[in-house]
Amino acid sequence: MKFKGKSNIIKEVQSKLGLKADGIDGPATWKMIWENLIHEDKGEPEKPETPVQKLKDDYPEVYKASPNQSGPIKPKYVILHHSSGSHDGTRSWILNAASKVSYHYLIAADGSLTQFVYDKKRAWHAGRSSWKGVSGLNGHSIGISFYGDTNKRTPSAAEIDSAAKKCKYLMDKFNFGIDNILTHEMIAPNRKNDTSNETYQMVINRIKEL
């Protein structure tokens, strides 16, 4: 393998910099290299990537109508759920009429949401349920679900943030307070275990920050 001599390399550099290509690496040559190559980028230094997931002001949302719905309702609660299955599996199940199950919203790992039932329509998510004298929470609440089992997996920061922002939006839209953000277990004790207490507290704490 042949290598070019030092003077030939210097000549090439000088030529690219618009200098006289004499092959002499004098002060003028190094000054131009410094100004035009090393300092070519005058912008901000590139920031290293961070493993912390960036949170968003708004999360992408799509609507896919579930056949499992009725209505209308006047929402005054949000019920947090988990599905126990994968995100895609849960999505398919909700779109299947045979399941007779639906949530208003399902949250993906990146915080994006799929809405299956409009806010003022009845989704079939609560089943036999009651809370402070109110029974049949399907007729009074909006169901938001994480995928998987939150007693076995901790939702991502984006999932928690997305859930909290959707809850806050619904609180403002329908004029109810944070005490009306509940879990499926709270309205159906001894029958349901979703979501985990940890997940619930993370959502509540994030809502308080908004």
Residue ranges and their predicted role:
Residues M1-D41:
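A short amphipathic alpha-helical interaction element
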Residues L80, I144, H184:
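Conserved, mostly hydrophobic/aromatic
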Residues K31, E35-G136:
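N-terminal catalytic cores of peptidoglycan-degrading enzymes
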Residues D25, I33-E35, E40-E61, P67, ...:
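Basic/polar, cationic surfaces and motifs that engage anionic cell-wall
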Residues S135-G143:
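Short coil-to-beta-strand
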Residues I10, Y105, I144, A163:
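Divalent metal-coordination and catalytic microenvironments
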Residues M1, L19-K20, S92, G148-A157:
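Second-shell loop/turn segments in exported
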